């Protein structure tokens, strides 16, 4: 099971951890993914989806259907 947002496609970022003595080591910054059961009004059904918290915040603002269409995601596959 990959750690990728199913709506936005957001995935892990490669970064650096920098110590006090400025020694840099590679670090993986994971996306904050949550499994959510959202009501899809147009389809009149519940949708189980794994999304990032950033996407969840956007869905609360614009709505699930509009957000999915803007990202080119078909909600019928969930």
Swiss-Prot record:
Source taxon at top rank: Bacteria
One function term, GO molecular function aspect: structural constituent of ribosome
HAMAP family documented for this protein: Ribosomal_bL28
Identification of the protein by name: Large ribosomal subunit protein bL28
A Pfam family hit: Ribosomal_L28
UniProt-listed PANTHER family: 39S RIBOSOMAL PROTEIN L28, MITOCHONDRIAL (PTHR13528), LARGE RIBOSOMAL SUBUNIT PROTEIN BL28M (PTHR13528:SF2)
Keywords assigned: Ribonucleoprotein, Ribosomal protein
InterPro entries in UniProt: Ribosomal_bL28, Ribosomal_bL28/bL31-like_sf, Ribosomal_bL28_bact-type, Ribosomal_bL28_sf
Source organism of this protein record: Prochlorococcus marinus (strain MIT 9301)
Lineage: Bacteria, Bacillati, Cyanobacteriota, Cyanophyceae, Synechococcales
Keyword Zinc: no
GO cellular component labels: ribonucleoprotein complex; ribosome
Annotated family: Belongs to the bacterial ribosomal protein bL28 family.
One Gene Ontology term from the biological process aspect of the record: translation
